[in-house]
Amino acid sequence: MQVQVSPAWKSIRIRGLLIMNKSQLPTLQDIEELTAFLPRLYAEGFSPIESWSGGEKLKDGSFSLPYPTYNPVVEEFFRLVSSKGWLDYEYDPEQAYQMLKDEDLVKTASLSQIKTMLTFCVRGERFSDGHWGQMIEEGYIRRVLERLDEIKWERRKDHS
């Protein structure tokens, strides 16, 4: 296994995945890449889930669990979130969900809080098929991306 550790111990690369600690925050470029998904995920007529499979009765009498086939844009978005240092490996799922539900908190969230909320959005699919679609359809991802868009403009203003 190839492991590369940055000099400041703020990030580590294992098998090609960049893992950042909580103090390592996304760059302006990282934010721009993510906010570019806002019009794509919320375009008129967009559906995050293309179809559901499974759920049928098997020969042994048991049932297979249903699972979604996601729109490729959804898969691309969550792949980017998972690979670009947006994950908080010390997050508390319940706390992250409470943060996501608090629209006022999301409107003023820090980058660290956004990482925590996005981690909940990404990781939830592992435990509940269709979670990604729910996060998009119920507007959680929209609100987080809108907050990131504000942070993007604040950072651009600070750098000009």
Language-model-detected regions and their locations in the chain:
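Short, Lys/Arg-enriched N-terminal segments with co-localized hydrophobic residues
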Residues: 6-19
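Short terminal alpha-helical segments
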Residues: 21-87
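Amphipathic, non-membrane alpha-helical rod segments
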Residues: 51-62, 111-127
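Low-complexity, small/polar and acidic-rich linker and loop segments
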Residues: 90-93
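Short, charge/polar-rich alpha-helical segments
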Residues: 96-111
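Amphipathic alpha-helical binding modules
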Residues: 116-159
